Amino acid sequence: MATLEELQKEINNHEGQLVIARQKVKDAEKQYEKDPDDLNKRALSDRESIAQSIQGKIDELRRQLADRVAAGKNIGKERDPTGLDPGDHLKEKSMLSYGNVIDLNHLDIDEPTGQTADWLSIVVYLTSFVVPILLKALYMLTTRGRQTTKDNKGMRIRFKDDSSFEDVNGIRKPKHLFLSMPNAQSSMKADEITPGRFRTAICGLYPAQVKARNLISPVMSVIGFLALAKNWTERVEEWLDLPCKLLSEPSPTSLTKGPSTNRDYLNQRQGALAKMETKEAQAVRKHAIDAGCNLIDHIDSPSSIWVFAGAPDRCPPTCLFIAGMAELGAFFAVLQDMRNTIMASKTIGTSEEKLKKKSSFYQSYLRRTQSMGIQLDQRIIVLFMVDWGKEAVDSFHLGDDMDPELRGLAQALIDQKVKEISNQEPLKL
C-alpha cells in the first residue's frame, strides 16, 4: 500500500496532467468552433473524456488519502494491549511486524493472467491493418525493441502511420495500432497484444516480408541465426535427406526403399500432429490465408526459419502444427540459454548478461508451447543440435575481448596518469 507521501505525490502528478488535459480541451473547443466537422468533434469528445478520467483518478486518490489519515488517527484507539491488530486470529503477537494491506479489488481470477493468449482474436485484429504499419511496428520492437520497451514500460501505446487509415462517414481517419507494454506486475488480457505476442504473430503471418527486410531481433542475431538462415533452403533439404537415427527400419514410404531419413521421421510426426491440431489453430490459419497472408506449409519452405526472427519466445500459432517447426524454435531457445551461460562464464560482458547465469529461455518456450496445445518432440531438437549446433555456437556474438598487449599498455598509461593527479589506486581497465 502506498504511503501518505506517495499518495500526495501521485495526486500532484495527476493534477499537473489535469491542467494539461484541460488546456487541450480548450484548444479542441477553439478548433471545433473554427471548423465544426466530425473529426474535430470527435477530438473534442476524446479530450473531454481524458480530462474527466484524470479528475476521477484525483478524486479517488484524495479519498484514499483521507481514509489513510483517518486510519492513522484511530490506530492507537483500536490497538489491542497484546499488540495484535483487530481481526488477527493469533492468541499471542507474532515475531513479525504488521506490513501493508494488499488491495485485491482490482483482480478478477476468472480472467486470463497472460498464460494463454487468444490467438484468433489477435490475428483477426492484426490482419485488419495494412502490412507497412505492421512491419514498421515490428522494426520498432526488434531492431529498436529494447529502447522502445524501456521508454514505454507499463503503458498502452499506439503506433500510427500514413499508410494506415479508415474512412468514417467519408472522412479519412488515422487507424492506430494498439500495443500493451507490460511491467512485471501487469496481468494481460487474453486478446491483449504485448511485444512478445506481436513479434510472434507478425513473423508467423509474414515470414517472407520479414526475410526480405531482414527484421531480426537482437537476441536472435547474437546466437548465429543469420549463419543458419543465409542458405536455409539448401541446408534444410540436405538435413531432411540425412539418414535418421531415430528410425532403424527402412522406410516404407521411401521411393528408393533405402534407409529412413529425417524427412520420413517428420512425415510420421506430421501425421501425429494432424490428429492433435486444435480448432483454434485451424481457424487461425484459415483466417490468415483468407486475409492474404503467405503462410509456410513445411519446414523446408524458403522462409520457414524466419518465423523465429523476432525472438525465441514461442512458436507462432500459424505454424505450430507443422512438423519440426515448434522444435526448431526450441532449438533457438536452447542456443539462447547456451550463449547466456557462456557470457556469464566470461570476465567481460554487460552487467545484465552476467546476471543471466540461470537463463530459462528453453523452459519458458516449453511452457508456452504446452499452453498452446502441443508437446515438443525433443528428439528432433537433438537432431538439430547434432547437425547445426556447433556451427551456431561458432557464430555466437560473445563480445570481443581486448588484446592482452594492448590492455597492458593502456593500463600502464592509466596507472601513470592517475598517480600524477591523485593519491587513489588506479582502477583496472
From Swiss-Prot:
Q: Which domain of life is it from?
A: Viruses
For the region Interaction with host RPS19, give the residue spans: 150-175
| Residue segments, region Interaction with glycoprotein N | 80-248
Q: Where is this region: Viral RNA-binding?
A: 175-217
What are the EC numbers? Answer: 3.1.-.-
Q: Look up keyword Hydrolase and say if it applies.
A: yes
Which residues lie within the region annotated Homomultimerization?
A: 1-79, 100-125, 373-421
**Name the record gives this protein:** Nucleoprotein
